[in-house]
Amino acid sequence: MKNIFKYHFHWRVKQPKEQFWTLFADTNRFNHDTHLPTIAREESINGSGLSKVLSFRKYGIKVVWEEEPFEWNFPEQFGVLRKYLSGPIKEMQVFCTLKSTADGFTEIDYKVEATPSNLLGYIAIPIQIGFLSKRDFSRAITQYETKLVEKKVLVDVFNRSQLSTIEKARLKKRADELLKSCDQHSRIDKLIELIEYGDDIALHKIRPYEIADLWGDDRKELLKLCLFATRFGVLDLRWDVLCPSCRGNTAKVTHLENLDSHAHCDSCNMDFTVNFHQLVEITFIPNPSIRQVSVGAYCIGGPQVTPHRVFQQIIAAGAEERFQLSYSPGSYAVVKAGSKNAHLLRIDDSSQNHRLDIIFAAEDTHSLEFVVSPQFEFLVTNSTSNDALVIIERTKWIETAATAAEVSTFQTFRDLFSHQVLRKGNAMAVGSLAILFTDLKGSTSLYRNVGDATAFGYVVDHFEILKQIVSNNDGALIKTIGDAIMAAFLKPKDALKSMVESVIQLRESGINSGELRLKAGIHYGYAIAVNLNNNLDYFGTTVNLAARLEQFSRGAEIILSETVFTDNEVSLYLKEIESLVKIERIESAIKGFDEENFYLYRVLVL
């Protein structure tokens, strides 16, 4: 009888390997689409070294195994070794490769080696792997090709409706109500199709920016649609807390007040401080009255679980290994799992260095910096007495995540979900924001000259104009203070552009003329989010400084801090509108910051 069963499956697909990798190397999705059962973590059993103990139940038999970390090199190969502690299999190894062909296709080779542990294994392996898995794998590969061509990668692999007749009627009714308030007919149709035909894995965590990119659509418009869909009971929103290392979910809450300032990642066994600018993102899921989405884990360690990691390999204790690698230019980190330090790696087209040589010692060494060309040899040495998991990962944060910092500066969110605030006493870092304060010069005399009712009408009109222009420039009105507003933006340029447009529009409307003129000040820097009077507000030195800048405006002028003025995007924008503005640099002390003088820049809108 055979001691090892070996299988080699081969496919040829139309897409380039980088594109097909996103589905094929998503082993959680692939296992789901090929009818494998959900898995569970066996918390009571400790794995050896780097491995984890997992289990599933198939045909009434509980199978338990010890799984080593997946190994991969994006987008060319991945594999895993499983050593079984119960069930009909003793050991199984999977190894997959993707190779580009001269005619633009991708050759896929999927190899499996399985060792039976008993008589049942000799019977089950040929049936399950040699026949059933081969059939299911081929079906999934064919469907993936179709989905990529049709740009429907989130749709159920067999394009089956997931809704009952009652659920369809309920969805249509709510979608019709949504359309009355959010005039995005084609987007709503696509969203309905996604909710009806999307698979559970895709719908368990809807990222609006990810969907926008897949549909070739505007990110902010998709976010707006999802927010309105939540308001009308089509979707529910959640706040996901992400681990800074593996970037996986560590917690989910439905309201900002339920966020804790500290969190723990079980997978990485690390504690971390939660912040708004990276570690909290808004996601959506269908409202359960329309569709119940239930997703278990089908695989917990495949390449697409941590897609920012382009390389992951186990290096045996005392071993030295070489790898030929090819990655796109950018910033990366080279780390050993469990280590506190990371080596910085910059891949640069202009570099003539084609070798990266790193030694991991028993004690963490200081972080080093390396520069290599896109094609390089990686020589890695593990001089410790334990196996090491060596990782190369992109340092750039998740591009498809709509972070809490960004969402909190989105006007639609503040209009629809003003009740979403932090718990009192809880503060979250939001990274750097552009903070804007305005005031109206001449408002006091206006009230005296034309009367309270007429003057108040002017002020309200000016608020509406500012709010709309701020929103159009990706900012949000945080609060009004008398005749003034406070607004926040992710980018200084957007804040400046909104004020230039506001001065012009107010002037055209007749508000920013005569004795009533707009004053504004903008500063950019670190801030924290707080609950102030049941409003999601910002606090810190950046806010305090920004609040004091508009006093230097003489009307129709925007005061910029030096940080804002020297921002690259701001500099380019000022060159674009140089015929519309006049710039003057001034030096002055600022109240509350008396120990130093500041360079400020008056931007007069002509």
Regions found by a protein language model. Name each.
Residues 419-420, 424-498:
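Catalytic NTP-binding/metal-coordinating core of nucleotidyl cyclase/transferase enzymes
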Residues 1-46:
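Hydrophobic ligand-binding cavity/cleft-lining segments
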Residues 81-135:
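Beta-strand/loop substructures that line and gate deep hydrophobic ligand-binding cavities in soluble
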Residues 52, 437-438, 469-497, 501-542:
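Catalytic core of nucleotidyl cyclases, primarily class III adenylyl/guanylyl cyclases
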Residues 374-375, 379-431:
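Regulatory cytosolic signal-relay segments
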Residues 230-298:
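Cys/His-rich short segments
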Residues 292-398:
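N-terminal accessory interaction module
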Residues 555-556, 562-606:
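Intrinsically disordered, glycine/charged-rich C-terminal tails and inter-domain linkers
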